[in-house]
Amino acid sequence: MSTQKQKLNKLAIFLIPIGIAVNVVGGQLAVLLKLPVFLDSIGTFVVGALCGWGPGLLVGLGCGLINAISLPTLLPYTVIGMLFGVLANLMAKKGMFSAVWKAPLNGIMIGIISTCIAVPITATLYGGFVGTGASVIVTTLMAAGWDVVPATFVSELTSELTDKIICLIIIFFVLKAMPARFVVKLPNGKYFIKED
């Protein structure tokens, strides 16, 4: 039993850098293209859902630290990525990745949670401007006479909802595409294997 548990831990540890790489590539692509979405949480959710909150949290932390190298303003948002790893674990245990129709609902829920955390960071530390594509929305709204907090809220909510709905649909299909013989070896694999 302990040998099997060590293998599970080794497999989960193996997936952490893969999750970080997926996040970093998605996040950097969104920043470079100035997209109004982030695309930097897919790896966190997949690893958190399959391997548990600890590996998911580490993926969120690693991604946040690496992304902050090229765009230091992203560092305070690392806490949100870490929270995603924990939430992915809870969502897996509650069967929230079991049907495609749940993905947009999950995206809305996660988008609202992340907006509530991101708005105070963005408005307080950066005056609404982080240097991502979402800053375009803030600029437009502030030019129209909006104050920084409501403009930041609308910008964050728009970006987060769009991003998280897209990401959670992708995550659903990634999880469904994984072979059962692989998934069953992971700590949360039992939540993704259907009994016949």
Regions found by a protein language model. Name each.
Residues 32-34, 74-76, 97-196:
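Membrane-embedded alpha-helical hairpins and interfacial helices in multi-pass inner-membrane proteins
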Residues 25, 46, 50, 54, ...:
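Short glycine/serine/threonine-biased micro-segments
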Residues 24-39, 61-102:
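Interfacial aromatic-anchored transmembrane helix boundaries in multi-pass membrane proteins
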Residues 22-27, 59, 63, 67, ...:
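Alpha-helical transmembrane segments of multipass membrane proteins
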Residues 55, 66-69, 177-179:
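A short hydrophobic/aromatic micro-motif that marks alpha-helical segments and, especially, helix-coil
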Residues 1-50, 54-65, 85-93, 171, 175:
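Hydrophobic transmembrane alpha-helices
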Residues 13, 17, 79, 145-146:
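A generic short alpha-helical patch detector that favors 3-5-residue windows
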